[in-house]
């Protein structure tokens, strides 16, 4: 049995949305599940979880790659606001808040024992004036 990535996506989405409601810098951004979500606005934050298996899979512990893609349209959201959103996501998912993150991801069948930041990739498309930043995280899920 592999971990339910869609559950992790949904729970992380809800977790990030809770910070929007609290007035964090993510206010005004659409948060969606999956990079290929059908109804994406021009500027959005997409969360995708992919089971990567890993060396501990035989013991019921799975590694999962979590990608958070922040995309903004230059005319819609200025670059400074884009950068602020990226930093807000990184801050929300920082180690100091790990207990809240794990509580948001865990469910009756699976427990996430950690979420580690692995880096970011940035890209800009001058023809469409879009800016994107993909944040990479690795999580470990155990079957309860």
What are these regions (language model features)?
Residues 1-29, 48-144:
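Charged, amphipathic alpha-helical segments and their flanking helix caps
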């Amino acid at each position: 049995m592999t971990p339910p990535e869609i559950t992790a996506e949904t729970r992380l989405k809800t977790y990030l949305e809770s910070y929007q409601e609290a007035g964090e810098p993510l206010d005004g951004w659409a948060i969606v599940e999956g990079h290929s979500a059908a109804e994406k606005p021009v500027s959005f934050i997409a969360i995708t979880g992919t089971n990567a298996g890993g060396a501990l899979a035989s013991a019921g512990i799975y590694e999962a790659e979590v990608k958070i893609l922040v995309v903004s349209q230059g005319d819609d959201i200025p670059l400074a606001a884009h950068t602020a959103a990226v930093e807000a996501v990184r801050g929300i998912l920082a180690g100091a808040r790990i207990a809240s993150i794990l509580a948001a991801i865990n469910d009756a069948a699976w427990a996430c024992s950690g979420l580690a930041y692995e880096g970011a990739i940035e890209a800009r498309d001058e023809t469409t004036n879009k800016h994107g930043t993909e944040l990479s995280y690795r999580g470990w899920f155990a079957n309860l």
